[in-house]
Amino acid sequence: MELKEKTTVRREDAAARLREIADELSSGNDIVLERDGLRFVARVPDEVVLKIEFEIEDGGAEFEIELTW
């Protein structure tokens, strides 16, 4: 199963969403996504691989955060 979420939001709203995800990770071991009335829950183990990627190109920039387990 794969669920992708891509929306245009204000920088502050993006920061708030990242904070929500960080809070979920630090307070438990689930990440919850809700879309169209459906709730998706991913169990996250105590140890994960964290990948941070920053890319600058002529047309803009991209910053990615990826957790795998």
What label would you give each PLM region?
Residues M1-K4, V32-E34, L38-W69:
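N-terminal intrinsically disordered, cationic/polar leader segments
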Residues K6-A14:
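Short, basic/low-complexity N-terminal boundary segments at the transition from targeting/disordered tails
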Residues E12, D30-V32:
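Charged, well-structured alpha/beta interaction segments
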Residues R17-L18, R43:
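Proteins with a high burden of low-complexity, intrinsically disordered sequence enriched in S/T/G/P/A and R
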